[in-house]
């Protein structure tokens, strides 16, 4: 499809109202999805809740392979399929819904910088823990990732994914990091987020933005995911305002809207 045709389709999609049957796809919640993908999915769910846009969550064993980018979550809205938080934020904005339009340009730049920090530090740490920490790989990751598939496909897919992630880690300079170094990076990230949040309810005072959705998705998932030990979640628990922030969003955007406690 040409760029002109794509732009035309996007304009048509933007003109259509948000449907009641909009769907978000992710892997199987109980036995398959891993920490990083669960965090990404929760971030998108929180963002859509903050925009007051209804979404139905559907779990599929092959969600990763259904996604146009190979990453989850992705949403199916009308005849459009969009994956990952950034593109979903832009897609929703094209439909007239934005959480950050009220920010000044300097604030928008700051918001994007903190989102980059979360993706570069927290997301990368989650991937490292899942695929490079031998205890986690052996006890959790391989079994969960390959759980929907028969032998030997379950092992083949898990080792293939592990190879991809390890190659990425080497490319970004994380290949030789120790677990302690990764946990220290997580602590530094949490410290920066805690200082920016301060005593405010959200990162930019009284109204949430996509940054709040992203941070909530990762921190809440870290706090509620059972791993081989509690070292990762303990880093988050050191910051009381981040804990209160997670509880505030869970209560306001999930419990108060009849969705029940996320955990």
UniProtKB/Swiss-Prot annotation:
Coiled-coil annotated spans: none
GO annotation, biological process: inner mitochondrial membrane organization; mitochondrial transport; mitochondrion organization; protein insertion into mitochondrial outer membrane
Organism domain of life: Eukaryota
Disulphide-bridged cysteine pairs: none
Keyword Ribonucleoprotein annotated: no
Major subcellular site: mitochondrion
GO cellular component: cytoplasm; MIB complex; mitochondrial outer membrane; mitochondrion; nucleolus; SAM complex
InterPro entries per record: Glutathione-S-Trfase_C_sf, Glutathione_S-Trfase, Metaxin_GST, Mito_Protein_Transport_Metaxin, Sam37/metaxin_N
Keywords of the record: Acetylation, Membrane, Mitochondrion, Mitochondrion outer membrane, Osteoporosis, Protein transport, Transport
Residue positions, PTM N-acetylserine: 2
Compartments, record wording: Mitochondrion outer membrane; Mitochondrion
Family under the similarity heading: Belongs to the metaxin family.
Function field: Involved in transport of proteins into the mitochondrion.
Quaternary structure annotation from Swiss-Prot or TrEMBL: Interacts with MTX1/metaxin-1. Associates with the mitochondrial contact site and cristae organizing system (MICOS) complex, composed of at least MICOS10/MIC10, CHCHD3/MIC19, CHCHD6/MIC25, APOOL/MIC27, IMMT/MIC60, APOO/MIC23/MIC26 and QIL1/MIC13. This complex was also known under the names MINOS or MitOS complex. The MICOS complex associates with mitochondrial outer membrane proteins SAMM50, MTX1 and MTX2 (together described as components of the mitochondrial outer membrane sorting assembly machinery (SAM) complex) and DNAJC11, mitochondrial inner membrane protein TMEM11 and with HSPA9.
Protein name: Metaxin-2
Species: Homo sapiens (Human)
Upper classification of the organism: Eukaryota, Metazoa, Chordata, Craniata, Vertebrata
The gene coding this protein: MTX2
């Amino acid at each position: 499809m040409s760029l002109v045709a794509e732009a035309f389709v996007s304009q048509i999609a933007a003109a259509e109202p948000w449907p009641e049957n909009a769907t978000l796809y992710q892997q199987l919640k109980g036995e398959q999805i891993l920490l990083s993908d669960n965090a990404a999915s929760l971030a998108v769910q929180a963002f859509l809740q903050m925009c007051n846009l209804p979404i139905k969550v559907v779990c599929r064993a092959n969600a990763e392979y259904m996604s146009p980018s190979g990453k989850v979550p992705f949403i199916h809205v009308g005849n459009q399929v969009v994956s990952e938080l950034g593109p979903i934020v832009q897609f929703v904005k094209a439909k007239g819904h934005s959480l950050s339009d009220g920010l000044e340009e300097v604030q928008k730049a700051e918001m994007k910088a903190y989102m980059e920090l979360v993706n570069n530090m927290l997301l990368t740490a989650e991937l490292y823990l899942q695929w490079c920490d031998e205890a986690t790989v052996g006890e959790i990751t391989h079994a969960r990732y390959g759980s929907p598939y028969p032998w030997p496909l379950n092992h083949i897919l898990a080792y293939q994914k592990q190879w991809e992630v390890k190659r990425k880690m080497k490319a970004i300079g994380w290949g030789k990091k120790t677990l302690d170094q990764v946990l220290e990076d997580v602590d530094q990230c949490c410290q920066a987020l805690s200082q920016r949040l301060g005593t405010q309810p959200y990162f930019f005072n009284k109204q949430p933005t996509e940054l709040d959705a992203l941070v909530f998705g990762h921190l809440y998932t870290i706090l509620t995911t059972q791993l081989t030990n509690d070292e990762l979640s303990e880093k988050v628990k050191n910051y009381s305002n981040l804990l209160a922030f997670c509880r505030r969003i869970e209560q306001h955007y999930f419990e108060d809207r009849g969705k029940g406690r996320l955990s």
